[in-house]
């Protein structure tokens, strides 16, 4: 999503496109954002990048801020009552030299008048330099992935949408929130999509409202956001994209599934949030004497972003491959270590004082090559250390909870393969947490063509309770299965059983905890998850009972037709899959793998919220307690 990056750069440059190859000093300024703005900016721009754009300070709108009267301020906030009041207060207090007000979503006329009145009252009309609607009310996590919100995400969660006691008004509010973000997304993209969705679902409600909102904007020729120089006019200039709106209820097994690829595992077992992973590291490895206080935990955060080449290359790889690659990178770096020492001595850097590099001038021939090659080598070392720590933390979970065994067993259930161990034995096995066992059983229950008999179910429930499981999620899934059409035709996941290549016995980097012994070296087969199958049918215009009755909307058509018959018979080159009710990295990776083999085609994955299995099972549990 280069468009979002460009839109932010433009905004931080006072809404003027930055001049290419500009050598002049940037204008120094402060950035004032709310939590929504912070969540949009932080996955895309580092503190260093902000500084390069002239941002000397970035502060939360509702924090205590001192006046800096000789510096301009760029605001990036949601147009809420609370935020508008605080901005008016800033004008009255004359905190900054000038004010560039940017709203994440469109501001209403009445709120705009409140700001105008405050500016007049504070005698600050000339200081309010610009007021912009940015239409950036969504969070870009990858070039091809976005999520609606992080703040207040419980308001648009799976639980919120599927509550049995939800009122029509509450449902309208949820749908309007989702539609506002999707509208912003397409304004930023600069494209009007063709919309397809299943009938009788929350996804259909979103489709109807989004179609109406896009249609109304197009009809208002003077104020249409889809004409002229839109930021995104490049990416989809040849053909309009397809928007596939999918309801989470079409597949509840995938979000519960144990996974085997790096990014999805990090999200499943670690604290991974808006592209940042937080790890707890014990200080000191030696064991504490009995009765002594437990060692303090050191908290470390790592950003896993587009600039991390290792992450970009391996985030979709099976975990054993990642472990292997970390080892190879380490060995290749060790071969260059002598070179690093030599370069450091040339540059007069002691030990690990890497901060000194930026202070050095390359005014001698001897230093020139060192200055260019040392930062590259040190960056390589930083990434190796980072991924050694992250992968080691993941590996600890795999080994202590036997996640490879759970992953393989669930794959067999979902692909209807022969099971080598009974489900009761898996639940009774001491390995794995109560939550792991509940996830496994729910996948079995969701995937089975025929629900287990009452006698069998009671046996399973007893085993789950003995294992310490909370049965509330099962109560909800039972109700869901009884009400859903899918009960008669369980979701097919294709034949995806992973192929074991025997056990790992290789010790990874000697002297570290990277020992893969006892972990299955599973090689993934291509999974054909429901979302991927639906996308393939609609993108390639295939006739299939699963998608033949999907509704079709074209906001550019003068009259909205209720037809499910597509006007366009050509396959699509670009598609956006959006899951109403929450998405996950397993689905995202599955779509990325699918599109790799399709030359010239692109897919973006979006969801109303991004949850891991722990967060999802908590929502199912809350629904089951109703």
Kindly give the residue locations of the regions a language model identified:
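Extended, well-folded catalytic/binding cores that form a central cleft or groove in large enzyme
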Residues: 1-626
């Amino acid at each position: 999503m280069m468009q979002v990056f460009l839109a932010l750069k433009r905004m931080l440059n006072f809404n003027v496109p930055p001049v290419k190859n500009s050598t002049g000093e940037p204008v120094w300024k402060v950035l004032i954002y709310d939590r929504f703005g912070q969540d949009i900016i932080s996955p895309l721009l580092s503190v260093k990048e902000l500084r390069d754009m002239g941002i000397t300070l970035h502060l939360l709108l509702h924090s205590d801020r001192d006046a800096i009267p000789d510096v301009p301020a760029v605001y990036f906030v949601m147009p809420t009552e609370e935020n508008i009041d605080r901005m008016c207060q800033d004008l009255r207090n004359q905190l900054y030299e000038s004010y560039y007000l940017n709203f994440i979503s469109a501001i209403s006329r009445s709120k705009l008048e409140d700001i105008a009145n405050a500016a007049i009252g504070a005698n600050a009309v000339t200081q309010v330099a610009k007021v912009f609607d940015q239409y950036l009310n969504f969070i870009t996590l990858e070039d091809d992935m976005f999520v609606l919100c992080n703040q207040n995400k419980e308001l648009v969660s799976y639980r919120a949408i599927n509550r049995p006691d939800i009122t029509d008004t509450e449902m309208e509010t949820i749908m309007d929130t989702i539609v506002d973000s999707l509208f912003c997304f397409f304004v930023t993209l600069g494209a009007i999509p063709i919309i397809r969705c299943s009938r009788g679902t929350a996804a259909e409600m979103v489709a109807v409202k989004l179609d109406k909102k896009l249609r109304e904007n197009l009809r208002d020729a003077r104020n249409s956001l889809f004409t002229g120089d839109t930021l995104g006019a490049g990416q989809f200039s040849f053909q309009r994209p397809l928007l596939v709106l999918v309801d989470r209820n079409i597949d509840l097994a995938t979000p519960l599934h144990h996974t085997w690829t790096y990014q999805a595992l990090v999200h499943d077992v670690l604290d991974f949030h808006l592209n940042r992973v937080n790890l707890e590291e014990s200080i000191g490895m030696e064991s504490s004497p009995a009765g002594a206080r437990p060692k303090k935990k050191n908290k470390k955060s790592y950003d896993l972003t587009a600039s991390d080449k290792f992450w970009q290359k391996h985030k979709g790889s099976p975990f054993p491959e990642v472990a292997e690659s970390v080892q190879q990178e380490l060995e290749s770096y060790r071969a260059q270590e002598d070179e690093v020492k030599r370069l450091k001595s040339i540059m007069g850097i002691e030990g690990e004082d890497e901060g000194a590099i930026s202070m050095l001038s390359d005014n001698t021939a001897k230093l020139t090559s060192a200055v260019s090659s040392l930062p590259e080598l040190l960056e390589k070392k930083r990434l190796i250390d980072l991924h050694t720590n992250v992968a080691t933390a993941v590996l600890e979970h795999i080994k202590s909870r036997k996640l490879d065994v759970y992953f393989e067993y669930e794959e067999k259930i979902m692909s209807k393969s022969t099971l080598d161990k009974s489900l009761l034995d898996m639940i009774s096995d001491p390995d794995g947490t109560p939550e792991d066992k509940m996830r496994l059983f729910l996948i079995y229950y969701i995937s089975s063509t025929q629900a287990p008999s009452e006698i069998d179910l009671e046996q399973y429930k007893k085993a789950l309770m003995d294992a310490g499981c909370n049965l509330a999620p099962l109560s909800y899934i039972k109700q869901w299965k009884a009400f859903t059409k899918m009960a008669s035709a369980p979701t097919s996941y294709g034949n995806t059983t992973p192929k074991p290549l025997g056990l790992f016995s290789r010790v990874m980097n000697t002297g570290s905890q990277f020992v893969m012994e006892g972990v299955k070296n599973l090689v993934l087969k291509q999974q054909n998850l429901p979302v991927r199958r639906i996308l393939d049918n609609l993108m390639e215009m295939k006739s299939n009972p699963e998608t033949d009755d999907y509704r079709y909307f074209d906001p550019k058509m003068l009259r909205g037709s209720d037809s499910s018959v597509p006007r366009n018979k050509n396959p699509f080159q670009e598609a956006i899959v959006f899951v109403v009710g929450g998405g996950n990295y397993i689905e995202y990776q599955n779509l990325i793998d699918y599109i790799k083999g399709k030359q010239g085609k692109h897919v973006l994955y979006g969801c109303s919220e991004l949850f891991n299995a722990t967060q999802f099972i908590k929502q199912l549990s809350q629904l089951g307690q109703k």
